[in-house]
From Swiss-Prot:
Gene Ontology biological-process entries: cell division; G2/M transition of mitotic cell cycle; positive regulation of G2/M transition of mitotic cell cycle; positive regulation of G2/MI transition of meiotic cell cycle
EC nos: 3.1.3.48
Name of protein: M-phase inducer phosphatase 1-A
Swiss-Prot/TrEMBL catalytic activity: O-phospho-L-tyrosyl-[protein] + H2O = L-tyrosyl-[protein] + phosphate
PROSITE patterns referenced in this protein's UniProt entry, alphabetically: RHODANESE_3
UniProt entry keywords in alphabetical sequence: Cell cycle, Cell division, Hydrolase, Mitosis, Protein phosphatase
InterPro entries: MPI_Phosphatase, Rhodanese-like_dom, Rhodanese-like_dom_sf
Ranges where the Rhodanese domain occurs: 401-508
Gene: cdc25-1-a
UniProt GO molecular function: phosphoprotein phosphatase activity; protein tyrosine phosphatase activity
Length: 550
C-alpha cells in the first residue's frame, strides 16, 4: 500500500533514464526510508560496498555547492536532452544531511504510465535490456529539459551531477539486503540470483554484441518476477537499439564509409580517363583503378588523312600572310645563292677511302704507282703478287717498265739447294740483305724504269715478310723521308710451295725440299741459332748507334 501511494503521488517523469534494475531498486529503498515507511529491515545494518560508494558520491563537491573542476563540454549540445538526477526536495531544504547511512540520491519520476504498452509490444526482448551494454564511443553529456535549470548555470549548481550518455555498470547490492528488503518470498530470491548470474556472464567482455535471446517460457517467468518494473526494461531496449552518442560521435566521412556500398574494382576504364591528366599523381587514391596499358605518347599512330596539318608546310613571308604549301612543291629560288665552303664534315667518307686506296697504290716514296698488279694477302701493309705475275715478269712482259728485278729467297740454304726459282738470291740473314743492298745501293740506269725486289720463303708467311720489313726500315733510316733507294718491294703470295707445282720449268732443280725435312734437322737447329744470334747482335749495334748520336 505504501508503494502504490508513493507511485501515485509522484509526478510523471519528463524523460526516460538509463539506469538498470539494481539502481532503481536502490532508489526505491531510499525513497521508502525518507518517507518513514515501515520496512522489515534493521537500520543498524553494516555498510555494504555499494552503500559506501553511494555515501562517497553524496560527499562530492557537486553536492556541496562548489564549482566543479571540469571544463564545460559543448560538443554535443545538439543531442537529445536527458533528465539530471536531483536530491529530494526535503533534503535540499534542510542544510544538512540526517545520517550518512540514509544519504542517497533521489530521481524524480522513476515510473512512466505511458510506457506500459511498450513492454507488451516486445515482451521477448525486454529481458535483454537487463543485461548491461557498454558503448565504446566517448560519452556526451545531455542538456537539461525545460522544467530544469538552464545549461548556462550547469557548472555552478552544486546539487547536480552530469549524467553520462553511456550505460553505467549496475551497482550490485549484497544478496542479504536484497533478500530482506525486496524479495520476502523465495521465488524472488531465486529470480534475482538468476539475474545476477546472467549479468556477471555478460560483464566478462566490456565490448559485446546484443546478448542471445532467451526462450519464451523463461521470458514469461522473468516478466512475472519484475514486480511492475517492466517499463524500465522497454526504455533500456529502445536506448540500446538507438544510442544517441554512438551516432553523434561519428563524422560525416566515417558515416559514409560505413553506410556506403563497397567500391567495385571492375570499374570501366572510360570513367578513369575522364580524370584530368594534369592532376598530380602523387596522392592518387589506392582504391581507384589505374589503366596499365595506357599509351606512352599522346598520338602513337599518325593519322592517314592527307589533309591534316602534319602534311602541310607553312612558309613565312614578309609580304603575305602564312600560306600552306605542299611538300612535293619545289621551293622558289631567292636570288643568287652563296656557295658553301667545303668542310671536312661535307666530304663523303667514300672519297676519303678512295684517296687512301690511291695512296696505297703508290710506291714507297709516293712518286709513282706500282708497276706490277698487286693482290691482298695476310699482311695488309705489304704488297703481294701472284705466281702468274712473277712468271710474266720473268718472261719479259714488263720490260718496258722494269729495268731490273731481284728475287730474294729467304729460306735456309738446304731448302734453297733442294729447289729454287731461277735467278733467285739466297739471303736468309739480315746482315746479308744489308750488305748486299744498302752498302752500295743499286740505282736504275734509266730514270723512267724501275728497280724491283721480290721476297719469298716457303709459304711467304714469316721469314719473307720479316725480311721485307727489315729492308724498308733500314732504307728509311738511311734516307730522308720519303726518299728511298728501293721504293718498290713485293711478296710472292703462297711462296715457293704454291709456285713450284704450277711453274716447274722456272725452278732449278725442279724439286721441293720442305723446312722440316727429316734429313736436315741438325741444319735447321744450326741456322735458327745463327739467325737468333744475328738478330741479337743487330739490336745491340742499333742501341750503340743511338747512344753515339746522343
Amino acid at each position: 500500500m505504501a508503494e502504490s501511494h508513493i507511485m501515485s503521488s509522484e509526478a510523471p517523469p519528463k524523460s526516460n533514464t538509463g539506469l538498470n534494475i539494481r539502481t532503481n531498486c536502490r532508489m526505491i529503498l531510499n525513497l521508502l526510508r525518507e518517507k518513514d515507511c515501515s520496512v522489515t529491515f534493521s537500520p543498524e545494518q553494516p555498510l555494504t560496498p555499494v552503500t559506501d560508494l553511494a555515501v562517497g558520491f553524496s560527499n562530492l563537491s557537486t553536492f556541496s555547492g562548489e564549482t566543479p573542476k571540469r571544463c564545460l563540454d559543448l560538443s554535443n549540445l545538439g543531442d537529445e536532452t536527458a533528465p539530471l538526477p536531483t536530491e529530494s526536495p526535503d533534503r535540499m531544504s534542510s542544510g544538512k544531511l540526517e545520517s550518512p547511512k540514509t544519504q542517497f540520491v533521489q530521481f524524480d519520476g522513476l515510473f512512466t504510465p505511458d510506457l506500459a504498452w511498450k513492454a507488451k509490444k516486445c515482451p521477448k526482448r525486454n529481458m535483454n535490456s537487463v543485461l548491461p551494454h557498454l558503448l565504446c564511443s566517448t560519452p556526451s553529456f545531455k542538456k537539461a529539459s525545460g522544467g530544469q535549470r538552464s545549461l548556462s548555470n550547469k557548472e555552478n549548481e552544486g546539487e547536480l551531477f552530469k549524467n553520462p550518455n553511456c550505460k553505467p555498470v549496475a551497482l550490485l547490492l549484497p544478496q542479504e539486503v536484497v533478500d530482506s528488503q525486496l524479495s520476502p518470498t523465495p521465488e524472488n530470491k531465486v529470480d534475482i540470483s538468476l539475474e545476477e548470474d546472467c549479468e556477471m556472464n555478460i560483464l566478462g567482455s566490456p565490448i559485446s554484441a546484443d546478448p542471445p535471446c532467451l526462450d519464451g517460457a523463461h521470458d514469461d517467468i522473468k516478466m512475472q518476477n519484475l514486480d511492475g518494473f517492466a517499463d524500465f526494461f522497454s526504455v533500456d531496449e529502445e536506448e540500446m537499439e538507438n544510442p544517441p552518442g554512438a551516432v553523434g560521435n561519428l563524422s560525416c566521412s566515417m558515416a559514409i564509409l560505413l553506410s556506403g556500398p563497397l567500391l567495385n574494382q571492375d570499374v570501366e576504364i572510360s570513367n578513369v580517363n575522364n580524370i584530368s591528366l594534369n592532376r598530380s599523381r602523387l596522392y592518387r587514391s589506392p582504391s581507384m583503378p589505374e589503366k596499365l596499358d595506357r599509351p606512352m605518347l599522346k598520338r602513337p599512330v599518325r593519322p592517314l588523312d592527307s589533309e591534316t596539318p602534319v602534311r602541310v608546310k607553312r612558309r613565312r613571308s614578309t609580304s603575305s600572310p602564312l600560306q600552306p604549301e605542299e611538300e612535293n612543291c619545289q621551293p622558289q629560288r631567292r636570288g643568287t645563292s652563296l656557295k658553301k665552303t667545303l668542310s671536312l664534315c661535307d666530304v663523303d667518307i667514300s672519297t676519303v677511302l678512295d684517296e687512301d686506296c690511291g695512296h696505297r697504290q703508290l710506291i714507297g716514296d709516293f712518286s709513282k704507282v706500282y708497276a706490277l698488279p698487286t693482290v691482298t694477302g695476310r699482311h695488309q701493309d705489304l704488297r703481294y703478287i701472284t705466281g702468274e705475275t712473277l712468271a710474266a715478269l720473268m718472261h719479259g712482259d714488263f720490260n718496258s717498265l722494269v729495268e731490273k728485278f731481284f728475287i730474294i729467297d729467304c729460306r735456309y740454304p738446304y731448302e734453297y739447294d733442294g729447289g729454287h726459282i731461277k735467278s733467285a738470291f739466297n739471303l736468309h740473314r739480315q746482315e746479308e740483305v744489308t750488305d748486299y743492298f744498302l752498302q752500295q745501293p743499286l740505282t736504275p740506269l734509266m730514270v723512267q724504269k724501275r728497280l724491283i725486289i721480290i721476297f719469298h720463303c716457303e709459304f711467304s708467311s714469316e721469314r719473307g715478310p720479316k725480311m721485307c720489313r727489315f729492308l724498308r726500315e733500314e732504307d728509311r733510316a738511311s734516307n730522308d723521308y720519303p726518299s728511298l733507294y728501293y721504293p718498290e718491294l713485293y711478296l710472292l703470295k703462297g711462296g715457293y710451295k704454291d709456285f713450284f707445282p704450277e711453274y716447274k720449268e722456272l725452278c732449278e732443280p725442279q724439286s721441293y725440299c720442305p723446312m722440316h725435312h727429316q734429313d736436315f734437322r741438325e741444319d735447321l737447329l744450326k741456322f735458327r741459332t745463327k739467325c737468333k744470334t744475328s738478330v741479337g747482335d743487330r739490336k745491340r749495334r742499333e742501341q750503340v748507334a743511338r747512344l753515339m748520336k746522343l
